Amino acid sequence: MHKSVLLKEVTDFLSNPCPKIHIDATLGLGGHAKALLEVCKDTFLIGIDKDENAIEIAKEKLKGFNAVFYHGSFKDFDIVLKEEGLLYFDSILFDFGVSSLQLDEEEGFSFQREDFLDMRMDKRQQKTAYIVINTYKEKELADIFYKYGEERLSKKIARSIVEKRKKKPIETTKELVDIVSSCYPYKYSKINPATKVFQALRIEVNSELEDIKIALSKLLDFAKEGSKFAFISFHSLEDRLVKEFIKNNADKLKVCSKKPITPSDEELLYNKRARSAKLRCAKLCYNEKKDEAFDS
């Protein structure tokens, strides 16, 4: 069962005061959206997600609320706003994590299942993890694993993949896990050796970091005085982009806390997938002092 990460913290921040127009740019199964709409009855929600299955589930969950739904990337939030005849939003949420639905279904996101190497969040796109693993050159694979997964054995793993696929295509997550694991000289106790490679593949297949950059580059163009921004990231590459955005706009943004908000010990007891989550939030304030964090 999917549990929305940092649910209380996000809801408390976004609902004080309640937004008239809220964009959940990564709607998922609608957990964050429902929590906000239960508090803010008059809020108009625009929900966007790449995963069509997730949208259908969210629609059911959010029946009776004032909401519209779009199948697409969070980077296109501005196009969606224009389709609704709107010029700006009052608040926006980005949750950059993979949903439990995607991890639990046969989508190739999880190395704990034996699935076909897919990893597409949006099934309309052509590129899959299978295509990346079986057609990219050795150097391209090594660069992806190092850049997006911060994998120190990137070259060795890429070399091994290329050797293996000469005999037969690498088709399943288990095959890939076995190849990556064989490159490690000893067994890792804390994380599966394939964790970083799977992260890198997911980012490459779905253009995740590029989409984040695009979204951040136009965010302020569709915000107004007092508009709120909430970002949930799950690894340093995502968080770094958000930090840079906030830093580069320090003269316009007021952060809700100096450091990112992380899950409480209580949340981690029932939601282990939240352990790496970080929430950064800010509001657009042209006319306020920015030297102190505000209380959400």
UniProtKB/Swiss-Prot annotation:
InterPro entries (UniProt xref): RsmH, SAM-dep_MeTrfase_MraW_recog, SAM-dependent_MTases_sf
SUPFAM superfamilies, sorted: Putative methyltransferase TM0872, insert domain, S-adenosyl-L-methionine-dependent methyltransferases
Role according to the record: Specifically methylates the N4 position of cytidine in position 1402 (C1402) of 16S rRNA.
Name of this protein: Ribosomal RNA small subunit methyltransferase H
Chief location category: cytoplasm
Top EC category: transferase
Catalytic activity entry: cytidine(1402) in 16S rRNA + S-adenosyl-L-methionine = N(4)-methylcytidine(1402) in 16S rRNA + S-adenosyl-L-homocysteine + H(+)
Species of provenance: Hydrogenobaculum sp. (strain Y04AAS1)
EC number in record: 2.1.1.199
Binding-site residues for S-adenosyl-L-methionine, renumbered to this chain: G30, G31, H32, D49, F77, D95, Q102
PANTHER family per record: 12S RRNA N4-METHYLCYTIDINE METHYLTRANSFERASE, S-ADENOSYL-METHYLTRANSFERASE MRAW
Compartment(s) of residence: Cytoplasm
Superkingdom, taxonomy of origin: Bacteria
GO biological process: rRNA base methylation
